Amino acid sequence: MAPVTEVSPMINTLEVADDKMTNLSSSGKPPRNISAMRHCNSTAWLTDYEGDERFGAKSPEGVNSTFQPVFRSGSWSDKGPKQSMEDEFICVDDLTEYIGSSTGAFYGVFDGHGGVDAASFTKKNIMKLVMEDKHFPTSTKKATRSAFVKTDHALADASSLDRSSGTTALTALILDKTMLIANAGDSRAVLGKRGRAIELSKDHKPNCTSERLRIEKLGGVIYDGYLNGQLSVARALGDWHIKGTKGSLCPLSCEPELEEIVLTEEDEYLIMGCDGLWDVMSSQCAVTMVRRELMQHNDPERCSQALVKEALQRNSCDNLTVVVVCFSPEAPPRIEIPKSHKRRSISAEGLDLLKGVLNEL
């Protein structure tokens, strides 16, 4: 098991990033109007299930009610071809210190831009802001929404941080069997459900229809996939040089979209990754890779490393960060596909037609 990111006990004051990046990159990213690869092209990783569908996140009825998830995670990062690393992540497999005897875990991926300040600050503070919220744990949705907004506003108030720094935020909060995914930006969470890919978050890109409508309603414009010609994401924390003042209406939103599911024994693992992964790999391809890796060595850290390595081989042009969370101590079982017992036949007319075609070859 990979070592988890150390998280200090909750305190009343927010932690500010200690080190500031000296050479800040541009706050924008390459245009996102080019479709991401939706197939698994590597010959080393052929998918068990063709296509890259959204299978729906509802848990099937009649599952084993005695299932109790056991959390173990692994992560891997690489700055890729960029000069600096602006991604951050957090992995906490055991929340006993924070929530008592209940089973719980917390994970996050934060894809920074315009320097590492916003991503580093969010990593250090967002989990404790969730758990310090008055609605936690009775309403994790309200607590999580509040934590995203509070983190965003704290970035505006922190004088030691670069106001032009911003970050996407993707978090997974698990209490007992209930998992809440919160996303603001274009990082993505994908559930591996017996080999099937289930996307639990939506990529918030300016060209997405719903995001475009929201942006234009608030007076924003989109140029070549960029919000106001500056950012390739429609939602982010920070970026106060774009948002202006707190309380003002701005097309760049910090509000997360939420997806909540109840884990079952069919839910094997969760993949969380920044857009550097998903720009070059489909969700289904990633799920298939992780499942086959787990069946070989059952190590989520090595799975994360394999995904990052594959993305680099596919010429990803961004920082890469991947977190893989397993829900069982055991490796996924082999999927047995029953053979069909139906007999196939062909008519005499069809046989003659087939012979004619073959004779012409």
Swiss-Prot record:
| Reactions catalysed, as given in the entry | O-phospho-L-seryl-[protein] + H2O = L-seryl-[protein] + phosphate; O-phospho-L-threonyl-[protein] + H2O = L-threonyl-[protein] + phosphate
Q: Where is the PPM-type phosphatase domain?
A: 72-327
- List the disulfide bonds in this chain: none
Species of provenance: Arabidopsis thaliana
The main enzyme category here is hydrolase
Q: Which cofactors is this protein said to need?
A: Mg(2+); Mn(2+)
Can you tell me which family this protein belongs to?
A: Belongs to the PP2C family.
Q: Which residues bind Mn(2+) 1?
A: 111-112
Ordered alphabetically, the record's keywords are:
Hydrolase, Magnesium, Manganese, Metal-binding, Protein phosphatase
Which of this chain's residues are annotated to bind Mn(2+) 2?
111, 275, 318
Name it.
Probable protein phosphatase 2C 47
Q: What is its EC number?
A: 3.1.3.16
On whether Endoplasmic reticulum is a keyword of this UniProt record, the answer is no
Quote the InterPro entries the UniProt record gives. PP2C, PP2C_BS, PPM-type-like_dom_sf, PPM-type_phosphatase-like_dom
UniProt GO MF annotations: metal ion binding; protein serine/threonine phosphatase activity
